[in-house]
């Protein structure tokens, strides 16, 4: 598992016990991405770029398949996403959250911010 600078900082800002809980819960290999539990995982897509979302406790972990494993872009509290959807005037239906996120430029700016800080 590879964290970019921004996602590493987001994890480091959490209490140590919560960090351990999230990392214990979020353990997967790139080949696991072919058989995901739809209740915990989602996909956010745009222009052929696929990010995956994992629901861990009150957090959302956004990541992608990487040649060296799994690259984590962001670790966000679920209310951060809800606030983002609210500010973007998007529906807050959990079932369509990923589809709506994939269509918004602001979400991809949030992800790109993490890539620039590697």
Kindly give the residue locations of the regions a language model identified:
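A short, surface-exposed loop/turn module that caps and links secondary-structure elements
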Residues: 28-55, 110
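A broad, low-specificity signal marking well-ordered, structured residues that form hydrophobic/aromatic
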Residues: 1, 52, 70
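Enriched for short, Lys/Arg-rich terminal
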Residues: 59-60, 64-118
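Short, functionally important structural connectors and interaction interfaces within domains
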Residues: 6, 28, 33-36, 68, ...
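Short, intrinsically disordered, mixed-charge
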Residues: 16, 27-31, 77
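Arg/Lys-rich, positively charged N-terminal/basic patches that mediate binding to nucleic acids
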Residues: 1-26, 96-118
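Short, cationic motifs built from Arg/Lys/His that form the positively charged side of catalytic pockets
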Residues: 21, 52-55, 60
């Amino acid at each position: 598992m590879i964290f970019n600078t921004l996602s590493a900082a987001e994890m480091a800002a959490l209490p140590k016990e919560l960090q351990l809980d999230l990392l214990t819960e979020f353990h997967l290999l790139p080949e696991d991405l072919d058989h995901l539990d739809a209740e915990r995982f989602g996909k956010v897509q745009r222009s052929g770029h696929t990010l995956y979302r994992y629901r861990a406790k009150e957090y959302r972990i956004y990541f992608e398949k990487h040649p060296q494993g799994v690259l984590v872009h962001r670790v966000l509290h679920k209310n951060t996403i809800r606030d983002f959807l609210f500010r973007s005037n998007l529906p807050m239906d959990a079932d369509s959250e990923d589809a709506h996120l994939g269509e918004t430029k602001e979400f991809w700016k949030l992800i790109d911010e993490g890539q620039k800080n590697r």
